[in-house]
Amino acid sequence: MTNIRKTHPLMKILNDAFIDLPTPSNISSWWNFGSLLGLCLIMQILTGLFLAMHYTPDTTTAFSSVAHICRDVNYGWFIRYLHANGASMFFICLYAHMGRGLYYGSYMFQETWNIGVLLLLTVMATAFVGYVLPWGQMSFWGATVITNLLSAIPYIGTTLVEWIWGGFSVDKATLTRFFAFHFILPFIITALAAVHLLFLHETGSNNPTGIPSNMDMIPFHPYYTIKDILGGLLLILTLLALTLFTPDLLGDPDNYTPANPLSTPPHIKPEWYFLFAYAILRSIPNKLGGVLALLLSILILIFIPMLQTSKQRSMMFRPFSQLLFWVLIADLLTLTWIGGQPVEHPYIIVGQLASILYFLLILVLMPTAGLIENKLLKW
């Protein structure tokens, strides 16, 4: 008799995705981040659900309801900080997952990669609308500044911004709709993640060498299930350490002041995971130009498969490309630092140089390195 997991319509899907899935025998811990992202998503949906039971999306009570969650609800402070720091862990895993894809050439699975870019945009949108909900100073002014960027669109910009606001400024209508978006988007992310996985399983996983591994596959269970459980435990350990020891380490103190439309904070800045894009936005002295650069800094990922010039898929055996990859990482860390600094000398010029280098590396230097390495193969 055949095992039920191989015949039952639902069990068969799970079996083919997590149990009998043929997996390359040599994938490293950099391949753990996909499952960690799934774990993050589940944790965020669960903690978010419990927060939504006590939160009120109204300008007069939103800030107080968050304070009420932290003070009066049983373990409310814990759920709230798990959710806030869970977002940071989500983005750490997301950036590591993308870095892995860039380094090992996983972007050559084009459908999987493009859905991944779409997932990134959706997660960024979710994090942005979520940051507005506590209705602190940085929530309010962050929402005002970022939504205002749409006014740079010629002709329809102002109308578009007022349509998103539901009025002439960020107000009650804005908060209510942002709560609605923040509630629905994670479920859209879940659906997209399922499609992401569907397309990945059409091709199978890539591996560090970038060479097809069809002749050397092992079953996903037990080898990678146990490896993913270890990764998950380390993720939960890190999240708990962050939440229980320094819950406000990554937050902004300004968000403990209730939103006040009449008082602008001295330094408006987003959460750390958006600072690199914010630095690129600020480094262009023209509003529309800045908005376009901001969009392009993320959308450039779509073009990466087309910019592949090397005959080798992975960077494992490509020293020049490796060097440029780590320069790109250093550049992104520099942009993250600059995004959190005030707009003054020398930060302005450093930000502008880092922004130019970011686009130069992806569009010019890395494809050129690929061509040079192709020549070196013939020596």
From Swiss-Prot:
A molecular function GO annotation: metal ion binding
Pfam families documented for this protein: Cytochrom_B_C (PF00032), Cytochrome_B (PF00033)
Keywords linked to the UniProt accession: Electron transport, Heme, Iron, Membrane, Metal-binding, Mitochondrion, Mitochondrion inner membrane, Respiratory chain, Transmembrane, Transmembrane helix, Transport, Ubiquinone
Outcome of mutating M98I: In strain: Isolate 1B and Isolate Timor sea
Organism: Stenella longirostris (Spinner dolphin)
Miscellaneous comment text of the record: Heme 1 (or BL or b562) is low-potential and absorbs at about 562 nm, and heme 2 (or BH or b566) is high-potential and absorbs at about 566 nm.
Disulphide linkage map: none
Gene Ontology CC entries for this record: mitochondrial inner membrane; respiratory chain complex III
UniProt-annotated binding residues for heme b b566: H97, H196
Listed transmembrane segments: 33-53, 77-98, 113-133, 178-198, 226-246, 288-308, 320-340, 347-367
Topology of this chain in the membrane: Multi-pass membrane protein
Stated consequence of mutating P266A: In strain: Isolate 1B and Isolate Timor sea
InterPro entries to which the protein is assigned, alphabetical: Cyt_b/b6_C, Cyt_b/b6_C_sf, Cyt_b/b6_N, Cytb/b6-like_sf, Cytochrome_b, Cytochrome_b_C_euk/bac, Cytochrome_b_N_euk/bac, Di-haem_cyt_TM
Protein family per UniProt: Belongs to the cytochrome b family.
Sequence positions that bind a ubiquinone: H201
Entry binding sites for heme b b562: H83, H182
Protein name per its UniProtKB record: Cytochrome b
GO biological process: mitochondrial electron transport, ubiquinol to cytochrome c
Cofactor note: Binds 2 heme b groups non-covalently.
Effect of V327T: In strain: Isolate 1B and Isolate Timor sea
Compartment(s): Mitochondrion inner membrane
Assembly notes: The cytochrome bc1 complex contains 11 subunits: 3 respiratory subunits (MT-CYB, CYC1 and UQCRFS1), 2 core proteins (UQCRC1 and UQCRC2) and 6 low-molecular weight proteins (UQCRH/QCR6, UQCRB/QCR7, UQCRQ/QCR8, UQCR10/QCR9, UQCR11/QCR10 and a cleavage product of UQCRFS1). This cytochrome bc1 complex then forms a dimer.
Cofactor(s) recorded in Swiss-Prot or TrEMBL: heme b
Chain's role: Component of the ubiquinol-cytochrome c reductase complex (complex III or cytochrome b-c1 complex) that is part of the mitochondrial respiratory chain. The b-c1 complex mediates electron transfer from ubiquinol to cytochrome c. Contributes to the generation of a proton gradient across the mitochondrial membrane that is then used for ATP synthesis.
